[in-house]
Every structure is written in structure tokens, then in C-alpha cells.
Curated annotation (Swiss-Prot):
Active site: 514
UniProt name for this protein: Ubiquitin-like modifier-activating enzyme ATG7
Family matches, as NCBIfam families: E1_like_apg7
KW Protein transport (keyword) present: yes
InterPro entries: Atg7, Atg7_N, Atg7_N_1, Atg7_N_2, ThiF/MoeB/HesA, ThiF_NAD_FAD-bd, Ubiquitin-activating_enz
Length: 664
């Protein structure tokens, strides 16, 4: 046995894990791996020995976003002058599991795999001898990554019989000329040629010479610990007890070692867990929260909660289609504020508000996007609601594209007073509709919802309507026109009316001017409105999704429903009643004489645009005449007259005095 001073020692390998590695791991964990904690193939990178410089004083394995591969590396290869090292990662689901797993048993299992591969191999295949393992846990809420890298190494002890710091110049030149084209790390030197085929010790009486292309330029003259597995192979499989190893370095600091085997344990022993910077055995922690841009962290956090839905409860959920929606909110009051917050929760990043009002002192307690300062800002007038709501959304989530527009929506029953101004505001509204995919109607009055209803049908937008009573609420979606769906076209907010909307805002008392409603109703209606939108988007027919749910209704509509939303039902109307804490669903077909969505109204709007709108606003009877409601009213009056005549109390005999008393 040699003394400790002559025992061959090594420079340990260190890992360098770039932040992009963890960013990619986080994405894969959320979107691909999910709850799968099985081993996944990865690869690492080392600078080619011929490309080392003075800063490469320790052997380093680098991991980055390119480390994630679909399958195991098939052969020794290089990329951008870097050796590609084969490895794997086991990413556990909980920190408790990460702490509890037996690291020694895990290392032993890796050592067993390495031993079997080495003993079955007849060449120094780099990817086998220099594999690595990563055990990790990803805390995606805090962006902390716990990891421990292992370089499984089979043990054998060697004594240094001779060290020579001067290599024969001819041999040095031979090695220099070949390393530029080699992808491996360990070779047998035969007549100046580097060979991966290794002779057994029984086939030669000479002390063989091997070349180890070192992965560091350590001044301590200690070779990289990557040499260990090659030495174990030579001792265990090839039977060598005495060898020469040229530790090649490209800085003319190569040296030759003559080694004698001290011990090759049987059974084999394995080591390999990386030590911390303090020299202790233990995992490392990468806290990306300290390195990342807070805005980017917020964006990732929003995606986190949503993508977790796909792990177990809703694996088929299409999050991209929700995130891509451009949403227009008409009304930035109580409903508008809550709808906007719910949309943010679903990852919607393009939201526009339209409202002509300003924040008053009664608003902040019921409308969560406003605060006390908004009430007296802008020279005491209060902030415009639309812009204040948009700014508040950006403070909540900087990644949202939120904009506010302070315009009035032209209202049926309210004649034009300033054509230039109102025409300009209509033009802005028209542009906003064209730029949007979804429109929420969240205004205070019925007549304010008429024009957006017409525009939504004419432009084929998804329109969601939410309205409040004192202790009730209504949430509904408007039907769209399609040649394939005409028979089942759903109605709109005005399809139950037999008169066109009128001015309901003039001559009202204070309790009629303010929205008097139980505060919780707005939250319920807003959340239902957003969830209804999500269900529609998850349906293959989108806005044409069928609202029929039971078999009787299906037969009634003569259609067998086979398509469903991934989130279940897509009802037409949801009516809630807080006095009984009940909720009912209804579906109502389009009314052919509807003042907002009938075909005649839609056609006139498409043809004439603003001119049509002006006619409807200035001429109270024009709209009813156009859609046929006037005729319906006339027919109703005629039918009522006929009914009265049929119920006449006049008979052939004289009228009873009791009858006269009742009539009078």
C-alpha cells in the first residue's frame, strides 16, 4: 500500500446551473410533467479539452435551457465546442418527498446502473462514463428550486509510482493534432494513435499508456474526478494493476502518471453527491424570485394557478383561447369592476373599459377598482371611471393591456343633442367593437344596452349581459346569426319585450337614479358572467353552443345535442334570487320582431350604420315600425277588443241589476 502522500487525488466536478435551466424546468413542470415525477432525460455541457482557457481551473458541468432533450443522447457528440454529457433529472412533487427520499439508496441504484453499463461496454464511451443525475423539487409559487447534482463514481484506489511533468514532444504533438476531432475523453495510446478499443491486461506484458483529456487546468496537478470511472473500468474489467496515464492539458501543462492499483472494492462502492460551496454534503437552493423582474414573476404567477387546473381537474382545458380574448367592458361600475377582476384571474390580458361617469364618494366601497383618492382627483370632479379602472388593473397586474374610454353610448329613447360629438363617440365605439372578441353589457339602464346589442349581433361578437335588481340578477348570452343554427338561435336581452326601449332615466327620484341592490348580487352576477364566457370558449361551437340540456327540450327543438363544453353546460340565461337563495336557468329563442336582434334591424344597421342609429334615436316610432312591433301591438289591441266583445254581458234578456252594479 502506498502512503497517503502518494495516493492519487482528484479535483471534484462542480455544476453550474443557469437560471434558464430552472425557467425551462418550471414551464415543463406546469405544462408537460405536471404530477409525473418519473426520471426525465437531460444533458449537460462541458468545454472541450482542446478549448479550455486559464479560467477553467475546475471541471464544470453546465446546465441551461438547452439541457432538456426528448430522448437519451445516442452517441458521443459536441455542440458549440462543448462536450454533451448524458444525464437525467428526477423532479419530485413535494418538499417533504425531496427531504425524505434516501439519498444513499438513490445513489446506490445509480451506481448499479453505471456498473452494469460499464461492465457491458468495450469502449470508453463518454456518455456512459460521465453521466450525471439531478434530484430536485420546484416550488413554483415562490420560484425556489431545491436541487442536488450527483456524479456517480465507482471507487478504486491508486498509488502514484512516478510523476513526470515533461511529456515527449512527439507524443504531445500527436495528441494535439487528434484532440481537435475527438468527442471522447479517454483513450489508449498505440503508436501515437488515440484508440477507444481497450486491450485486456492478459494480452500484453507491457505497461499500457492511456490518455485522459482533462476537463480542467487545475494548478494543483490533480486530474479531474472524471478519471475515476475509467480507472475503475481498467481495474475491474480489464484487469490492469499498473498503468501509465497522460493527463492532457492544452496549455502545455500536461503530465504523466505511473499508477499502481491499491484496491478495487468488491462489492463495488459508489460516491458522487456534489458538495456545497462550504464543502458539506447537501442540496443547493436557487431562488429565482430574487433574480427575476417582478412584472415577469407576476405574469408567471397568474399562469401558475391556471395551469395547475390542467394537472388533475381539467386536463383538456384550453387556456390559450381564454388568454387571447380581447374583451370590451361597457360599464366600469360595480359589475364592470368585478367582471374585470374575474377576467384577470382567468389570464385575460386585453381589457377595455367604456364609461362616461366619474368616481363618486359612494363608489369605492362597492366598486373594488376605485379608492378614496379617486373620488376627489381631477380638480375635485373625481377620476373618470374608465381610465381609473384601467389604471387600477395595471397596478394589480402590470402585464395587462388595459385602456379606458370616457364616452357615452348612444341610447334609444334619447334624441341626438350634439350630432358631431355623439357621432364621433359612436365612431370610437364602433372601432372598439371591431377590435374586440367579447363584449360585456354592464350598464345601468336598459336603453344603454340596445345599441351594443345590435352591434354585437351585426358584428358576430360574443355578448354577455349582466343586470341587477334589488335582490335578483340576470346573466345571459346573446344569440348570434348563423345559417346553420337559425332554428336554435338564442334570444337577446330585448327578445321578451313587445315595445322598443324608452327613456327610463328622466324624472327619477334618488332611489331610482342609484343602483339599489344587495351588495353581494353584483359579485355573484359578475362571476357567473365570466364563468359563462369561459364555458362558451371551451365549447367546440363557441358562441353557437347549444343551451338545451334535458332530453324533453332536445326533442322539442328536434336536435340531438352531441357537443358539450369541457366545463359542462353553456346556459342561455341564469336568473338568481337572493330572497330565496335560488337560481334558475332558461333558454329563450330569438324573437322575430325583437327591437334589437331581429333580422330587419340588423340588416338596416349593417347597411346604414350611424344614420340608422340616428333615425332610431330621433324617431320614437321608427324602430317599432321597422321590426314589426307596431303591427304586433295593433294585433294585440284588436285581439283584446274582440275578447271584450265575446265577454260582453249583454244577453238576450235584460241585464241583471247585480251585473250593472259590477260594471259601474
Amino acid at each position: 500500500m502506498g502512503s497517503d502522500l502518494n495516493t492519487l487525488r482528484f479535483t471534484p466536478i462542480q455544476s453550474f446551473v443557469d437560471s434558464s435551466f430552472f425557467a425551462k424546468l418550471a414551464r415543463l413542470k406546469l405544462e408537460k410533467f405536471k404530477l409525473d415525477s418519473s426520471t426525465q432525460y437531460i444533458c449537460g455541457f462541458q468545454t472541450r479539452p482542446s478549448k479550455l482557457n486559464k479560467f477553467d481551473d475546475i471541471p464544470t458541468l453546465a446546465l441551461d435551457e438547452q439541457s432538456f432533450v426528448e430522448e437519451e443522447i445516442g452517441k458521443d457528440s459536441i455542440a458549440n465546442d462543448r462536450l454533451i454529457t448524458s444525464g437525467s433529472i428526477t423532479n419530485l412533487n413535494t418538499i417533504e418527498e425531496f427531504k425524505a427520499i434516501s439519498k444513499q439508496d438513490l445513489l446506490h441504484s445509480w451506481g448499479e446502473d453505471l456498473y452494469q453499463q460499464i461492465m457491458a461496454n468495450d469502449t470508453f464511451e463518454y456518455k456512459i462514463f460521465q453521466s450525471f443525475k439531478v434530484l430536485s423539487y420546484s416550488d413554483l409559487k415562490k420560484y425556489k428550486f431545491y436541487y442536488w447534482v450527483s456524479f456517480p463514481t465507482l471507487q478504486s484506489s491508486w498509488t502514484i509510482l512516478e510523476r513526470n511533468d515533461v511529456i515527449n514532444s512527439g507524443i504531445q504533438q500527436d495528441i494535439d493534432s487528434q484532440t481537435k476531432y475527438l468527442n471522447g475523453q479517454f483513450y489508449q495510446l498505440r503508436e501515437g494513435r488515440l484508440d477507444t478499443q481497450i486491450e485486456d491486461s492478459s494480452n500484453t506484458e507491457l505497461v499500457p499508456t492511456f490518455v485522459f483529456l482533462d476537463s480542467c487546468l487545475s494548478q494543483s496537478k490533480r486530474p479531474s474526478a472524471q478519471l475515476k470511472n475509467y480507472l475503475f473500468y481498467l481495474a475491474k474489467k480489464k484487469g490492469y494493476s499498473e498503468i501509465k496515464v497522460i493527463v492532457y492539458r492544452n496549455n502545455a501543462a500536461s503530465f504523466l502518471l505511473k499508477l499502481k492499483l491499491q484496491e478495487c472494492p468488491d462489492p463495488w462502492k459508489v460516491v458522487g453527491w456534489e458538495r456545497t460551496s462550504q464543502g458539506k454534503l447537501g442540496p443547493k437552493l436557487a431562488d429565482l424570485g430574487l433574480l427575476s423582474d417582478p412584472t415577469q414573476l407576476a405574469s408567471q404567477a397568474v399562469d401558475l394557478n391556471l395551469k395547475l387546473m390542467k394537472w388533475r381537474v381539467a386536463p383538456e382545458l384550453d387556456l390559450d383561447i381564454i388568454k387571447q380574448q380581447k374583451v370590451l367592458l361597457l360599464g366600469a361600475g360595480t359589475l364592470g369592476c368585478y367582471v374585470a377582476r374575474a377576467l384577470l384571474g382567468w389570464g385575460v390580458c386585453n381589457i377595455k373599459f367604456v364609461d362616461s361617469g366619474r368616481v363618486s364618494y359612494s363608489n369605492p366601497v362597492r366598486q373594488p377598482l376605485f379608492n378614496f383618492e379617486d373620488c376627489f382627483s381631477d380638480n375635485g370632479r373625481g377620476m373618470p371611471k374608465a381610465s381609473a379602472a384601467a389604471n387600477a388593473l395595471k397596478k394589480i397586474f402590470p402585464g395587462v393591456n388595459a385602456q379606458g374610454y370616457e364616452i357615452e353610448v348612444p341610447m334609444i329613447g334619447h334624441p341626438i343633442t350634439d350630432e358631431q360629438k355623439q357621432g364621433s363617440q359612436y365612431g370610437v365605439l364602433d372601432d372598439l367593437f371591431n377590435q374586440s372578441d367579447v363584449v360585456f353589457l354592464l350598464m345601468d339602464s336598459r336603453e344603454a344596452r340596445w345599441l351594443p346589442t345590435v352591434m354585437g349581433v351585426a358584428k358576430g361578437k360574443i355578448v354577455i349581459n349582466a343586470a341587477l335588481g334589488f335582490d335578483s340578477y340576470l346573466v345571459m348570452r346573446h344569440g348570434n346569426i348563423s345559417s346553420l343554427k337559425d332554428k336554435l338561435r338564442l334570444g337577446c336581452y330585448f327578445c321578451n319585450d313587445i315595445v322598443a326601449p324608452e327613456d327610463s332615466l328622466s324624472d327619477r327620484t334618488l332611489d331610482q337614479m342609484c343602483t339599489v341592490t344587495r351588495p353581494g348580487a353584483a359579485l355573484m352576477a359578475s362571476s357567473l358572467a365570466v364563468e359563462l364566457l369561459v364555458s362558451i370558449l371551451q365549447h367546440p361551437d363557441k358562441s353557437f353552443a347549444n343551451a338545451v340540456e334535458n332530453n324533453d327540450d332536445r326533442k322539442k327543438h328536434e336536435e340531438k345535442v352531441e357537443k358539450f363544453s369541457k366545463f359542462g353546460a353553456c346556459p342561455h340565461q341564469i336568473r338568481g334570487f337572493l330572497n330565496t337563495f335560488s337560481q334558475n336557468k332558461f333558454h329563450i329563442p330569438n324573437y322575430e320582431h325583437c327591437s334589437a336582434c331581429s333580422q330587419k334591424v340588423v340588416d338596416q344597421y349593417i347597411q346604414n350604420g350611424w344614420e340608422f342609429v340616428k333615425d332610431c334615436l330621433n324617431n320614437q316610432g321608427y324602430l317599432e315600425e321597422l321590426c314589426g312591433l307596431s303591427k304586433v301591438q295593433e294585433e294585440a289591441e284588436l285581439a283584446a277588443q274582440q275578447l271584450l266583445e265575446e265577454l260582453s254581458f249583454e244577453e238576450k234578456g235584460e241585464i241583471d241589476s247585480e251585473d250593472l252594479d259590477w260594471i259601474n
